[in-house]
UniProtKB/Swiss-Prot annotation:
UniProt superkingdom: Archaea
Pfam family, one: DUF192
Entry-linked HAMAP family: UPF0127
Protein name listed in UniProt: UPF0127 protein MJ1496
Similarity-based family: Belongs to the UPF0127 family.
InterPro entries: DUF192 (IPR003795), Saro_0823-like_sf (IPR038695), UPF0127 (IPR022906)
Length: 114
């Protein structure tokens, strides 16, 4: 799969249009001080335990951690918090806080679409 061509991510029955964090600046800043509307931001990594923060965030966010095309962990964070994923992950999807029951999506299949 060519990473730059990913336009959508499907998590179970949910579908997200994504902005790919495909360079150092986008990965470093993520959603800090910006609003990408209803889209989500997708981060791709080599398999590891991902640590992140919500410093300078303008709003709470939901974060979905993905490994082997399955949701392995999901969390809702307010601004000015830190979090380290307890599971190994190869991708992270972050988006504005929603009404999704994050516990319900653990284990859901994830599809990366063009």
């Amino acid at each position: 799969m060519q990473n730059k061509k990913i336009k959508k991510v499907k998590v179970g029955n949910l579908e997200f249009e994504v902005v790919l964090a495909d360079n150092f600046i986008k990965r470093a800043f993520g959603l800090m001080l910006r609003d990408i509307g209803d889209k989500a931001m997708l981060f791709l990594y080599k398999r590891r335990k991902i640590a992140m923060h919500t410093f300078f965030m303008l709003y709470p966010i939901d974060i979905i951690f993905i490994d082997k095309n399955r949701v392995v962990e999901a969390v809702r964070l307010k601004p000015w918090k830190t979090y380290k994923c307890k599971n190994y992950s190869t991708a992270m999807l972050e988006f504005k806080c929603s009404d999704i029951d994050l516990n319900e999506i653990i284990g859901e299949k994830v599809e990366f679409m063009r």
